[in-house]
């Protein structure tokens, strides 16, 4: 059996040495270890958007964020919160830039703010290191998204009005809104990044984007036209599902497969442009084939005879 630490100490100086040892032990505990809470200190400030929202104040009391009889929540209270779960899902907040005071928060979970249909603006706190896919799904009024500039894992560079993951190598847009702009440096769009963004009418992709995640633009009901960027090989499941205003889809030569439900519920779709010599595979991507397909000169018969593309209303050769 290993000798306990306290029995290995030789108190050669008697009581004096014991006293010195005790003081050293106390000093070590006062300094603390490197694992101590590293959340930044915040100045006391009332979070007005919560103070005037009694349903959320009730939740704050129930969660123990504030005392049971408290009538306000401050930035100091918010700094002690380390988990929000889906408490704000479906909330009636209009703006929540004071969310930045939740500096103890490390993770924003799936659907954390989903279905908050009045939310127009939010700022992500500095200490968040993990934002789940779909955290802001179905927030149709959202028009301003920013990240605290002290955050080392996410940012909103170039005033993009979105959340960009910066720590996984290639830049990935995790969440966007109707005013999001995509810089040429973004290589990925995360699953559900724009899901339910009903105010989005157009989107311009970087030319060399590599991947658009599943359900990324699901239920973007005002989106009218899409040009899939060069570099994307698969149109993932449900990517544009429920885009009821989508009229024209332009594919590129890099597209190999249209996955299940990719364009399901696109009731206005009337035109697909496909420049590939060999028709891409279609895996139940459409629920209607009342669409005219435009292909390069000399390929009409190839598409008409293809087991996937022969079901479309018409195939025409581009001039």
PLM regions and their residue ranges:
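N-terminal low-complexity, Pro/Thr/Ser-rich intrinsically disordered segments
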Residues: 37-55
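Consensus positions within tandem repeat domains that build extended binding/scaffold surfaces
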Residues: 109-112, 133-135, 190-193, 213-216, ...
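N-terminal Sec-pathway targeting helices
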Residues: 3-18
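Alpha-helical transmembrane segments
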Residues: 17-25
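Short, aromatic/basic amphipathic alpha-helical patches
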Residues: 284-285, 301-312
